[in-house]
Amino acid sequence: LEDPENRAHYLRFEKKPGFDAAALGVYTLENGHIRRITGAANGISEYLCVYDCQNSSTVDILDPRITDAFLALTHEKYFERFGAEFGKGIAGFFTDEPQYFRYETAYTPVLLTEYKKAYRADVLDLLGALFVDCEEAPGFRFRYWRLMNVLYTENFMGRVYRWCLSHSCRLTGHTVEESELYTQMWCCAGVMPFYEYESIPGVDWLGRKIGTELAPRQVSSAAQQLGKKQVLTETFACAGWDVTPKELKRIAEWQYVNGVNLMCQHLYPYSIRGQRKRDYPAFYSEHNPWTDELKTFDDYFTELGYLLANSREQADVLIVHPIHSAYLMFDRANDEASVRSVGEPFNVLIERFGAAGIGHHYGDERLMEKYGSVKDGKLTIGQCTSS
C-alpha cells in the first residue's frame, strides 16, 4: 500500500459546465445516447466527467501483478520457512473477504487492455454509461460487470488457488456480502464463480438472524456441482456476549439444512484485553465461561457434518441465478434501488421455496458456461442434473 501503483481504483462521476482534460473520460448525452468527446465543443452545456481515483485502504486485487506480489510477500515466505509442513501440519490457507473497492463504482486500469481483448472495443468509449441512463447503458454495464467478475475470480482467487495446489496445500475462506444481489455487486459482481477456486468453498454468516437461504445455498450449490465435499461457514461472529448455545445451535442447524457441513467458529483470540473484547463477539475460547461445556455441541455438529459431507443432496429444481440480470441495471449511486426489480422478486422466490421445503440449487451462468450440458431434456452442471 505504500506504493500508489498497488492501490485500489474506483470511478467518480461529475457533471461540469466545461470540458475537463484531467478526467479519464468525458461524455455528452444526445437524444438518449451517450458519446465520448475529446475536447470542448459548441452546443454542449453539460459535460459528463468520469475520474479514475484511488483509495489507500486496500490493493487492486484485479491486477495479476499485484496478486503475484502479494503471494511473494506472504505465501512464498511461509513456504520458505515451513515448506516441509505444507500439506501436513500446515493444511492450507484461509482467505477472508477479498473484494474490489466496494464503497464506490469499482474500476481497475487492467480493464484498458482486458476489455479490448474480451469485446474488441475501448472501455473508455462508453464508461459514462455506468452513471447515466442511456440506450447504451444495459449492454455496456453487462459487459463491464461480467468482466469485473472474471478479473476478480481469475486474477485473484484463481491465482491464489493454483499457488496452493502447486504447493501441496488447500485453500478455503469466503468472499463478502453474499446474501443480496446488490451487495454482491458492491464487492465482486457475483460470488458463485469464486467457489470454483476453493478446496473447501466457504461462506460468512454473522449475527443471530436467520435470513433467506441464498448465502448458504449459493455456496452449497457450487460445491455440489463442482464435486467439492465440504462446505465451510465462518459463523457466530456478532452474536454478542449474551448469546446462548441454544441460539448457536439454531443458527448452525439452519445453515446445515441449506448445505453447509463444516464449521469455523468466530473467533479464538489470544487475549480480550481492551478493545479486543469488542471484536465481533462472542468468542469461543477459554475467555468464554461456558466454552468447556461446548464439547457435546461440537461433537454433534462434527458428526452431522461428516454425514452430510459424505452424502449428496437430491435437489431436482435449479434456479438460474439472476446476478447477470443485475449487471444490466446496477448503478452504485442508487445501490439497492437500481436492482430492486430483480432483487425483490428473487427474494420472494427464495422465501417461498424455503417455506415449502423445496430443495433447490442455483445455477450461475459463468459456471453453466464452463460445466453445463443438456442431455435427454435434462440440464447438467458438473455433477448435478436437474429435470
Q: Which residues does each PLM region occupy?
A:
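Carbohydrate-binding surfaces of carbohydrate-active enzymes
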Residues: 1, 10-12, 80-92, 99-387
